[in-house]
């Protein structure tokens, strides 16, 4: 806003854009840690420009201020947390060889990076039934935790069970912890 009454506005340039690379970066989140600004956003494989591809997942960037030159995390890949292209087929196979099969089995999306590095996601399909068809999940995915340091992130494998916490493990009523505790917590 250009005034305190918030009746005049000015458009500012985007914090990050993927022109000619990716036409969709969504759910941007700013995370502050150790004097750095971390910008996380999500994207999808099918939103990359022709001839380019990347995994569905969380992409992260680090800068010295809100309006700084953000640099991609993890050796300039930007990938902070990604899904395999398709868990149903071996690498190198077509993306979706059978249009009746969900290419998203066991895959999560719509990630949200929270303070402390916890990541909530949504999951569509959670494996297959006895016929091998995906079972609809339609729910929050298991929580994971990212370790964030400098220009690097990694999945915290000590969180939960080998890096996977409980479904919707959001410790909003307790101090930040290592997490992964799926027992009910009493509100204080």
Regions found by a protein language model. Name each.
Residues 1-188:
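Carbohydrate-active catalytic/glycan-binding domains of CAZyme proteins
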């Amino acid at each position: 806003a250009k005034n305190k009454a918030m009746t005049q506005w000015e458009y500012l340039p985007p914090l990050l854009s993927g022109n000619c690379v990716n036409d969709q970066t969504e759910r941007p989140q700013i995370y502050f840690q150790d004097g750095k600004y971390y910008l996380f956003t999500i994207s999808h494989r099918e939103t990359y420009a022709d001839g380019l591809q990347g995994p569905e997942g969380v992409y992260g960037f680090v800068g010295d201020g809100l309006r700084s030159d953000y640099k991609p995390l993890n050796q300039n890949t930007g990938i902070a947390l990604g899904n395999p292209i398709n868990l149903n087929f071996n690498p190198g196979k077509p993306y979706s060889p059978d249009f009746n099969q969900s290419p998203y089995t066991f895959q999560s999306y719509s990630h949200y990076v929270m303070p402390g590095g916890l990541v909530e996601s949504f999951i569509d399909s959670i494996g297959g039934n006895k016929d091998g068809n995906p079972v609809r999940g339609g729910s929050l995915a298991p929580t994971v935790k990212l370790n964030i340091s400098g220009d690097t992130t990694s999945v915290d494998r000590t969180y939960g069970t080998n890096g996977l916490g409980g479904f919707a493990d959001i410790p909003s009523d307790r101090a930040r912890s290592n997490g992964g505790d799926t027992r009910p917590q009493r509100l204080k």
